[in-house]
Amino acid sequence: MGTKLSVSLEGASTPETAPRVDRPPTFDPQYGFERPRKVREMKATWEEMEQWKLKPAQRDYCAHHLISLMKCQTQNAPFAGHACDGERGAWDKCEYDDHIMRIKEFERERRLLQRQARKEATA
């Protein structure tokens, strides 16, 4: 529950080792991995997202699941709540997995910045 507060306090006390969330990662995404990591790709096109009028916050790697949920809801209205459980579950799981992946990337960046600071301090 206090993650946001602890991250912001850590960023204020040691800004050189706190990752910036408004900028791309400073380290190579493949650094430290034996095999290359799979590059994430958008499955929904910009045209589909425009057609379904997705908000900017909804245009993420899970947009294709949201579009299929919205299609199901329009086809099964007014009983879409029960008919679209599978699509809703797929979208929720994708959003959860995306959130976990972003947290892991943030933690990886933070640890690499701390490691870099330790190396510079000893050199």
Curated annotation (Swiss-Prot):
It is found in: Mitochondrion; Mitochondrion inner membrane; Mitochondrion intermembrane space. It is a peripheral membrane protein. Disulfide bonds join 62-94, 72-84. Residues 59-102 form the CHCH domain. It comes from the Eukaryota. Residues 1-32 are annotated as: Disordered. A motif (Cx9C motif 1) lies at residues 62-72. GO terms for cellular component: mitochondrial inner membrane; mitochondrial intermembrane space; respiratory chain complex I. InterPro entries: NDUB7. Pfam families: NDUF_B7. Keywords: Disulfide bond, Electron transport, Membrane, Mitochondrion, Mitochondrion inner membrane, Respiratory chain, Transport. A motif (Cx9C motif 2) lies at residues 84-94. Accessory subunit of the mitochondrial membrane respiratory chain NADH dehydrogenase (Complex I), that is believed not to be involved in catalysis. Complex I functions in the transfer of electrons from NADH to the respiratory chain. The immediate electron acceptor for the enzyme is believed to be ubiquinone. Contains two C-X9-C motifs that are predicted to form a helix-coil-helix structure, permitting the formation of intramolecular disulfide bonds. Complex I is composed of 45 different subunits. Belongs to the complex I NDUFB7 subunit family. This is NADH dehydrogenase [ubiquinone] 1 beta subcomplex subunit 7. The gene is ndub-7.
